[in-house]
Amino acid sequence: MKRPPPLALTLGDPAGIGPQLAAEAWRRLRHSGEGIFFWLGDPRLVERAVPVTCIATPEEAAAVFADSLPVLPVPCEVEVIPGQPDSRNAAATITSIRQAVEYALAGRAGGVVTNPIAKHVLAAAGFPYPGHTEFLAALCDMPGEEIMMLASPQLRVVPVTVHVSLRRALETLTTERIVQVAEIANAALRRDFGIMSPRLAIAGLNPHAGEHGMMGDEEITIVQPAIDRLRAQGIDCRGPMPPDTMFSDKARPHYDVAICMYHDQALIPLKTLDMEEGVNVTLGLPIIRTSPDHGTAFDIAGPVTETCRADVSSLLAAIWLAGEMSAYREGRGS
């Protein structure tokens, strides 16, 4: 059987815990036979902690992975001081993402796993995107088609509105956007997760899902019409569901993904249930992208040594999920 292409792991912010996580993930996976990846980063950041092999192409990664961390060099502009981000190194962070996406689009990487970035650091360097997701969509020439899923073993959630204020989220919530997000999520569950008959739970916006219009009418005027249109397409969806009960132990087994109306409605339950193994997944793009569901953790960043201070669980989950999604796309899924 042909070996699947390796995953591309990005640098993230070099002053954060990304380099620590890359080294520790390699230690955990090197002998597993799964999750082979190469790191697009500065080898100087990790070479004192783990054996490193600098590679020129992704195709070289698998042959060296058991013995050393494959690094496709992306040098930082100035010295990296752990815990002290420097916008002069933003170019390396951006280049790492750009190259990873190019390899994935060409089929030379099975997917992209992104280490955490600091949005304010990139913004200070003139980066015009609010985050990873929007940049990835632009690189794939599909702006506006991307949606964010947070996934853990216990729950999958997709917010309809994402990185905007709550006031702005309410202003931009439309029937059309709910339908678009649900359609993308439904297709992704089939293609990337092997769920042939996805069950979607559509959250209400207001307390008690509006209580028949007594606590707001968005469920009647916006959400229910979206559900009707989705059902007309043959998509299995239920709702509008009261947000205060749909994440209970009894409710979760009855759906495969929760379509939520705004950011915190989706992320609070997922992070409460499983902060350590939550994975950020970008859906709606031609490439696979996952990311650990945490930030740069500048407060615990330190020199990369043989002992990792950061919890690598979420990154390992992101690598595992990217590998599983790649397998489903190639017809190798379990």
Swiss-Prot record:
Binds 1 divalent metal cation per subunit. Can use ions such as Zn(2+), Mg(2+) or Co(2+). Its main location: cytoplasm. It comes from the Bacteria. Its EC number is 1.1.1.262. Homodimer. HAMAP family: PdxA (MF_00536). Belongs to the PdxA family. This is 4-hydroxythreonine-4-phosphate dehydrogenase.
